[in-house]
Amino acid sequence: SIGTVDRVLHHREGVSEKTRKKVFDVINEIGYKPNIYASILSRRKDFTIVAIIPYFQTGEYWELVYNGITRAVKQSQGLNIDLKIFYYNQFELESFRGACRNTIDVQPDALFIAPIYKEETIRLVHHLTSLSIPVAYIDTKPGNTDYLAYFGMPLFESGYLAADLLVGSDPGVKEVVSFNIDRGEAPPNDSTLNRHRGFLAYLNDNNPGCTLTDCSMSPFDFLYNMRLFDAFFEEHPDVRHIITFNSRAHLISDWMEIRGIRDKKLLGFDMLQANMRALKNGTISVLVAERTDKEAFKAVKSLIDFLVLRQRPPRRDNYSSIDILTRYNVDFYLVEE
């Protein structure tokens, strides 16, 4: 009877061993598996996932992260997932600390974070994991923390590859300029630092006579950047190889477009629409890229699977492929998947 089968499936008393064996034999024969999702819905438990990310404007890197986060939650509709996003100013430490305090106040079931402020992130993660709250990282992962999963590009290797793409075909290059974001009092981003280290390692291995000159540009002030680029290349007219280790190569390509400059090779990172448009028009020569939105999606999905199914990802550290984009293949990446 249905009642007997129900008692066997839920390990209740009142069933003989002979009957229990018959029921399990039939279950194994037909390949029955319990509907885990139906069981979850019947429990009516809500799960709160907190995501801590910087404020962003349309077209910026963090919009890709946001899109991946929200897509993962939308695809899990019906599983009682409550998403709370705490935004902060990535150039202000106190703003990040406020997002951390908000997270602790909420007492979430899981945390998604891209660490920018390393020490504060470590303190937050230590607090949460001491309460058995799982954490998923993207971009970078600070050492000495427990976490469920990490999704991101192999950063050092991407910097090494970038150097090969930029100067590998021309061993006579004597100087490369790196323009990176002036972060004020905020610490350098670990992802840019690791790419920078990889780039220098390549030069040391393959072109030790080439120097890398570092300059800071503004993330927001267009006129300041125009003056900066004008002044630098007036003083360094022979420098023809340019790199930025963050997602803002389009700031440099805008200057090149306005000034009509076509004799320089610019390499950048990340598949922002502005970068990809510049790649198409030739002001950016190469983009080294990852699928940021997919990484954010997978990170949040790993948290949901753990909360709902108690399922850990197959791997703790999940490194994405490194995509090399040129004007000849960029159209295939402009299509939304």
Segments the model singles out, each with a brief description of its role:
Residues 1-44:
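N-terminal helix-turn-helix DNA-binding module of bacterial transcription factors
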Residues 150-176, 225-226, 275, 291-308:
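Hydrophobic alpha-helical segments within soluble ligand-binding/sensing domains
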Residues 35-94:
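Amphipathic helical "hinge" segments at domain boundaries
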Residues 120-157, 272-280:
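Flexible loop/hinge segments that line or gate small-molecule binding clefts
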Residues 26, 30, 186-187, 203, ...:
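Hinge/cleft segment of the Venus flytrap/periplasmic-binding protein
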Residues 110-129, 213-274:
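Hydrophobic alpha-helical
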